[in-house]
Amino acid sequence: MIIVESNLDVADNSGARRVQCIKVLGGSKRRTASVGDVIVVSIKDAIPRGKVKKGDVHQAVVVRTAYPVRRADGSVIRFDRNAAVLINKQMEPIGTRIFGPVTRELRARKFMKIISLAPEVL
């Protein structure tokens, strides 16, 4: 469960390392984001010569959360840390590689490019 000011790891090679949520998209009263939701983030830590730099504002899709995600079959999946993948205005990832597992919930949200780049889908 991601709220405003939550810090997330970046699970791609766009050049960002850490981001901070500054807005949860999807309605004026929406307060929390879960796996598959799009958020607006500010880059807090980035590597030199990356595609993004510190202070940039981008959209990102949440791919892993520490808060448990309950599925229709009753199973629950959670991760050690929160992570996101930076995306552009066309909802395609900025990076060319995805690090770590992603969840099946992204398929229902039509993030097929992220699913295909991920090494493991849980």
From Swiss-Prot:
Gene Ontology molecular-function annotations: large ribosomal subunit rRNA binding; structural constituent of ribosome
SMART domains named in the record: Ribosomal_L14
Keyword Cytoplasm among record annotations: no
Protein origin, superkingdom: Bacteria
GO cellular component, as recorded: cytosolic large ribosomal subunit
An annotated GO BP: translation
Entries under HAMAP family matching the protein: Ribosomal_uL14
Keywords: Ribonucleoprotein, Ribosomal protein, RNA-binding, rRNA-binding
Protein family (similarity comment): Belongs to the universal ribosomal protein uL14 family.
Its job: Binds to 23S rRNA. Forms part of two intersubunit bridges in the 70S ribosome.
InterPro entries on file: Ribosomal_uL14, Ribosomal_uL14_bac-type, Ribosomal_uL14_CS, Ribosomal_uL14_sf
Coiled-coil stretches noted in the UniProt entry, renumbered to this chain: none
PROSITE patterns: RIBOSOMAL_L14
Subunit structure: Part of the 50S ribosomal subunit. Forms a cluster with proteins L3 and L19. In the 70S ribosome, L14 and L19 interact and together make contacts with the 16S rRNA in bridges B5 and B8.
Pfam families: Ribosomal_L14 (PF00238)
Name of protein: Large ribosomal subunit protein uL14
